[in-house]
């Protein structure tokens, strides 16, 4: 429904349209709803997949070393790769079962897999605030995007077009 509404208004001038969202809040004694102006995130991307790619693509073009970004990058990479593989092969496999279909070089495949697992799954408190260094993040993002390009260059071009159009 969300994307359908945005498609209806795509052709209108910016100054003749606005988007609003209803946020529900639970309080201790009652539930309330607040109407708020829709943020850019919901109007800039037509899917979470496009948003995740934009994060990887923008990082590849201009790496940032802020901990706020690096902390989430392995999870962003994992979710993007899982979605790509599920879409490409119409299988709902775990990333371990299908990542080698995307990243065919065994060393690079293992490097990306470990990066996505180790830094995005905090199963114990000893891994709670560990960050991958910037060089490792850059290398793995390059591996992922280059692998998508090798496997499906038309799809990657479409993703880049979607990201640069926002």
What kind of region is each of these model predictions?
Residues 129-132:
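Non-catalytic alpha-helical scaffolds
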Residues 1-89, 94-118, 135-166:
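C-terminal lobe/lid and adjacent interdomain/linker elements of RecA-like ASCE P-loop ATPase modules
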């Amino acid at each position: 429904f969300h994307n359908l509404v945005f498609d209806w208004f795509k052709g209108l001038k910016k100054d003749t349209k606005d988007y609003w969202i209803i946020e529900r809040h639970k309080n201790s004694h009652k539930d309330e709803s607040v109407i708020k102006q829709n943020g850019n995130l919901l109007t800039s991307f037509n899917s979470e997949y496009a948003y995740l790619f934009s994060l990887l693509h923008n990082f590849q073009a201009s790496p940032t070393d802020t901990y706020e970004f690096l902390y989430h990058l392995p999870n962003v990479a994992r979710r993007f790769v899982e979605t790509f593989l599920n879409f490409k092969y119409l299988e709902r496999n775990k990333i371990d079962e299908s990542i080698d279909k995307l990243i065919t070089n065994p060393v690079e495949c293992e490097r990306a897999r470990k990066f996505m697992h180790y830094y995005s799954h905090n199963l114990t408190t000893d891994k709670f605030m560990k960050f991958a260094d910037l060089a490792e993040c850059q290398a793995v993002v390059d591996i992922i995007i280059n692998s998508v390009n090798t496997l499906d260059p038309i799809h990657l071009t479409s993703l880049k077009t979607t990201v640069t159009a926002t």
